[in-house]
Amino acid sequence: MAPRQLGLVLVLAALVACHSHASPRAHEVSVEVDRIALDPSSGAPVVVLEDRRGNRSLAIWIGFAEASSIASEMHHDHPPRPNTHDLAKRLIEDLHGSVSRVVVTELREGTYYSVLVLDAPGGAIEVDARPSDAIALALRTGAPLFVREALFEATDEPTPPQAADEHST
């Protein structure tokens, strides 16, 4: 088996190993990336997801590299070489899969969790992912974003105000 084929088989095997049960859709809210902001108190980047009905938002603190990746995709500003999220998109596509949706599923001990739902030749696969990585992939693939309803009530973090230097949609 050629090295490239072996690599693709190993990636597909890893995706299958991460398979878990499908999550319920009844308690999910469709959201979109509203903006990337900086937390005024810490200077940390925050991705703000807004309920598509426009009445609620959820702020998730993320890393600078992920914020840069999300912002560059929001503004269609592609670097000359692929970053990690571009690579993941390419691997999924080359394995004849697609990202069907992303769901931010829970908040546990101050950390948000999400799943990347993939349609693969063998069926649907849910892969645990950091929300920032899952959001970056959703933006690159056009996959819809969802947040579990309970997370809007569970968070007590204020959404950072919008400033002039933020990356908005």
Q: What residues fall within each predicted segment?
A:
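Divalent-cation
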Residues: 21-64, 68-169
